[in-house]
Curated annotation (Swiss-Prot):
On the 2D-gel the determined pI of this unknown protein is: 5.0, its MW is: 46 kDa. This is Unknown protein from 2D-PAGE of fibroblasts. It comes from Mus musculus. It comes from the Eukaryota.
Amino acid sequence: PKPPDRG
């Protein structure tokens, strides 16, 4: 799965 969004 894609990593969590950062920001």
